[in-house]
Each structure stands twice: as structure tokens, then as C-alpha cells.
Amino acid sequence: ILNMRPDYPAYTEDGSINMISYYVENPLFTLKNIKEGKGKDFTGSLGLEWDIIPGLTLRTNGTLKYGINKNLTYNRKYYDDGTSSSTVSKNESYTYVWDNTLTYLKTLEDHNLVGLLGFSIEKYESDGLSASGSNFPDDEVLTNLGSAATKNSIASSYNSNTLVSTFARLEYKFKNRYLATFTFRADGSSKFGPDKRWGYFPSGALAWIISEENFLKDYSHIVSYLKLRASIGKTGSQNLGNYAWRTLMGSATYNDAPGIKPSSLGNDILQWESQVQKEIGLDYGFWDDRIRGSIGYYQKKVDNLLYSDPVPYSSSFSSVTQNIGSLKNKGFEFDVKVDIIKNTQKDLTWDFDFNVARNITTLEKLNSEAEYFGGGAYDYFKI
């Protein structure tokens, strides 16, 4: 919002921008202030594939992602006793991913088998540096932080996390109508403490393509596709900070004396948030798939919910990440799509879509027992 009166001169007699007062900023100063961000990103990938023997293939692939961001803010002083300031920050990040899979394919008459073993490593690192200063001798040297009479702050940061995964998958198909899939994976994340780092997640699925059965062949002009499926699987989440399991220390000053203080409260018994989902469904198609859709029922159970839980203020902290409880939701889904008009020769189509779903969520368990207390605690520790 501009609050400069229109009768105020924009420039002084010597041609410089008119400095009015603390309460009235000449918009020409705002135009000369600089606030910009610059960024560069690079992604590179290299892969190798080796057919060891017929049906057995080894694949390895490495990916590197690099990003750099720089933010600059230069503010000129806009009144006689004002203070100019500058802030510069820079951040670099790297993500390394190395994936390896060994795949085996085998077909024997009516039997089809696909097996896969895999190993993956993903590592993320970021480095940051920022500095700010104020009270420059001249606005033309705002880009040189060394010329600031007051060095406001200098800060650096480093973040990293690593995820190591092993996994296996087995797919079996018989006569293109009976299908089975089984998977297992183990994930180890540096976001958890040494004793809770690994999570284990199995899953399985069965399917029966009923429309391929002989007793429906005479009705294929009506029932073009019919598939019954069921599955159960467990997945994990590591949606938390890189160092949530560790109590971190930060810098502080007291009476101009340097010191350190706890900056965040860690929890070394944090573990993977897990979700078990069960589902049964039917996929259908009628009259050459002119009418098609699916209907399904599912249940999901989430255990060891990760949540930033409030703690008493007397602890000097506001919250700590914890596994606080479990959720359960269940429901059904139904959808249908109808091709009312389907004339490919004249490029004329008219579709009708309809879907309905119902979901019920229940909080089954809550471990949080935090109580709020007034007041606070000093967080300065003199060394």
C-alpha cells in the first residue's frame, strides 16, 4: 500500500530520491530494492542391461539429481536515519539413486512365471549457507556483505537421509485366467533410530478372469470381461523429519557469551508407520465393453501413526514426534462407464460415467496423553 502524498516531490533538488520519513516510504525506493531467486537443476541417469541367459536379465541404473538455489534480498534505506540491509542465502542439494534388479521369465505350456529380486539405495544431502548484514555506508555496495557495519547473522545447515531397500516379487499365471502375485520388501531408513530402522512389508494378490472360462464362452457377446480379484498388503511411511529420532542442539548467546541449547526433542523409539489394506473387487464389461466398470470393498488399518505430539511447556519444547495410535477405515466403491454412442468412423462418441463411494474412518487407538501447562522455561545455557 502506497501512502506517499501526491504533492511530495519524488526527487530532491540534487536529483537523488527523496527520503521523506519512517512512516512514509517513497515508492521509488521499493522499485530499487532487489529480491530475487535463482535456481539450477540437473538430472542424469545411466543404465546397463545384461541378458545373462535366456529369460534371466540383470538391470542396473544410477540417477543423480543436483539442484542449487540462491536467494538475494537488498533493501535500501528510505529515510535519513534508516538502515539498509542485505541477505544472501545459498542451498545445494544432491540425490543419488542406485537401482538393481534381477528378473527371471519362464513360460511352460499354460504356465507363466515372472520372478524379480531387487536392491536399491537412495541418499539425499543438502548444504545451506546464509548471511545478513545492515547499516551499509552506501546503498551502492549492498551486494558486498563485508562492507556492512553490522553483521546480523551467519548460519549454515546440513541435512541428509538414506533409504536402503531390498525387494522380491513373484508373478504366476495359468491359462491366462488364474493369476497370483506375491511381493516382499524390507526398507531401512536413517530417519529412525538404530534399533527401529527396518520395516518389513509383504503383500499378495489373487485374481480369476471368469470371462476366460469355457462355461462363459457362449455368452462372450454379452459378458466381454469379468474378473474377480482379492488382495492384502502392508506398506510403510517414513513421513517425518530427517533427525526426528535425535535430540538436537543449537547455538545461543547469553550476556554476549556463546553457548548451546537443546533445539528439538528426539524420540529414539520411533518406528515405521504401517498400513495394512485388504480389498476384494469385481471388474466387469458387457457387450464388447460398451458397459464397463468395477465394484469393490476395502479395509485399511493404519498403525503407529506418526504425529508431532504436543508436550508440556515445562519441558522447554512444544512437541515431539511420536507413534500415537491407529486408524481404521473401510468402504466400498462402484463405478460404471457406458458408451451411449460410439461411432469411430465419424469420430462421434457420447459417454456416460457414474461412480459412488462410501468411506467410514474410525480412530481405534490414541496413545497421546499430553496435557497443557501454562508458563515456560528458559532455553539459554551458559557455558
Protein language model annotation of sequence segments:
Residues I1, S16-N75, S84-I383:
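Extracellular/periplasmic, surface-exposed regions of secreted and cell-surface proteins
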Residues Y11-D14:
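Charged, amphipathic alpha-helical segments characteristic of ABC-type P-loop ATPases involved
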